[in-house]
Amino acid sequence: WRYDPALAGISAQFADCGIHALHMASFIAGQEPIELSADFVSCLPTRVLEDDAMVSFKMSGGAVLRLWTSSVAIGRMHGLNIQVFGEKGGLRWAQEWPNQLYWTPLNGRTEILERGGPGLSPEADRASRVTIGHAEGMPLAFANIYADLAEVILARREGRTPDPLACHYPTALDGLQSMVAIDAAVASAGKGGAWTDARPPSRQ
């Protein structure tokens, strides 16, 4: 059904998986997409919608984002990989090895930061539920979001300021951004990858 427009809508792979990667990338960079250029491919002739998508984004703070999502990458098991490159170095994280973050400073050696290890940010410490060396698991990632949202709701009901570390949960605007990105990516792919505005009207 994911590739049937009558059931899935205008996009398959990008709408199913790509928007989650886009949201994570926006959160990590602290920037929102401004424009995008999309290349959609259907590797099976029977599929109307895309099963492989490569989308480039121009972000609000000047960053460049390259997003690839595919359901035909044989041998990759939910291979979510995030890489960030900046003037001070590069970061790399892979979902298949979720407890390690690789940091390579410019002209330096690669360091491995372990989840739950010393010297991490308060946000990272707060999100760790089990001791170092034990897998957190995907459900706990969602539990962190629900716990943060519950803290904000309770704080509002009780008339107090919520814990500032709990204010990083996805909002309705993030959902709107995902829907706008799907429409823009479909339009861009249909125009041979033409750069297309990826902002919701409220951010234009």
Language model: regions and residue ranges:
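Glycine-rich phosphate/pyrophosphate-binding beta-alpha loops
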Residues: 19, 45, 68-76, 137
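Glycine/proline-rich active-site loop of Rossmann-fold NAD(P)-dependent oxidoreductases
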Residues: 31-32, 47-49, 63, 76-80
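C-terminal glycine/acidic-rich active-site capping loop/insertion
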Residues: 2, 54-61, 88-169, 204
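A general structural signal for well-ordered alpha-helical segments in protein cores
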Residues: 21-22, 145-150, 182
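C-terminal capping/lid region of NAD(P)-dependent oxidoreductase domains
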Residues: 187-204
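Predominantly a Rossmann-like dinucleotide-binding segment in NAD(P)-dependent oxidoreductases
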Residues: 1-47, 101, 192
